[in-house]
């Protein structure tokens, strides 16, 4: 399938590109060992995505994590998180473990964390929400500057973990998905507002290969 990403730009061991031809171009700035991402884009959802992606290729089983230090949204549904993606096409199968900018209720989600996935190219996205519903306190609240995200791959099983400095890694969800053994991984950001950019500060990115 032909990719509709703009030509990738090399950056500190990663490449970065706009996926899905968003109206506003995205950018990346290195700050120490972290990255500030700016992105436009309509959304990462339904059958096709628009976002900015800071990525590298990983093969086999792995464990990746990142801290979202701050998040300036352009919409209630602006999304920042870790992406695992089969291709750079806008309709690619993928998984994303993400945070929203605050703990406001959003449809089925009470809290700020969410896991979503697309099983086939051009298919609809699905989401895994926290089980807690209003008026209870959020089950997975954001806690900036310490909103941590972690993704682990073991074969076709993908596990998402959330953490703050208040508590250790907690399993958010597990999902089976048949993806290629070599995938694109890294921080991703979408504005959910085609005419206004969002900004997120990603820090403390780590990765390890599993044998």
What feature does the model see in each segment?
Residues 1-211:
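Extracellular glycan-recognition regions
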């Amino acid at each position: 399938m032909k990719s509709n990403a703009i030509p990738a730009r090399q950056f500190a061991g990663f490449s970065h590109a706009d996926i899905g031809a968003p109206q506003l171009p995205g950018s990346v700035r290195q700050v120490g060992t972290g990255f500030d991402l700016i992105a436009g884009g309509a959304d990462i959802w339904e059958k096709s995505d628009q976002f900015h992606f800071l990525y590298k290729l990983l093969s086999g089983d792995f464990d990746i994590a990142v801290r979202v230090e701050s998040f300036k949204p352009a919409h209630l549904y602006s999304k920042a998180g870790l992406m695992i993606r089969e291709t750079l096409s806008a309709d690619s199968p993928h998984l994303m473990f993400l945070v929203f900018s605050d703990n406001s209720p959003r449809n089925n989600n009470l809290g700020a964390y969410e896991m979503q996935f697309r099983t086939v190219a051009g298919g609809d996205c699905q989401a895994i929400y926290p089980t807690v519903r209003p008026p209870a306190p959020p089950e997975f609240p954001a806690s900036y500057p310490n909103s941590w995200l972690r993704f682990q791959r073991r074969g076709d099983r993908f596990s998402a973990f959330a953490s703050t400095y208040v508590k250790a890694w907690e399993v958010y969800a597990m999902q089976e998905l048949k993806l290629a053994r070599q995938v694109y991984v890294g921080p991703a950001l979408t504005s959910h507002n085609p005419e206004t950019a969002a900004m997120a500060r990603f820090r403390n990115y780590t990765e390890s290969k599993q044998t």
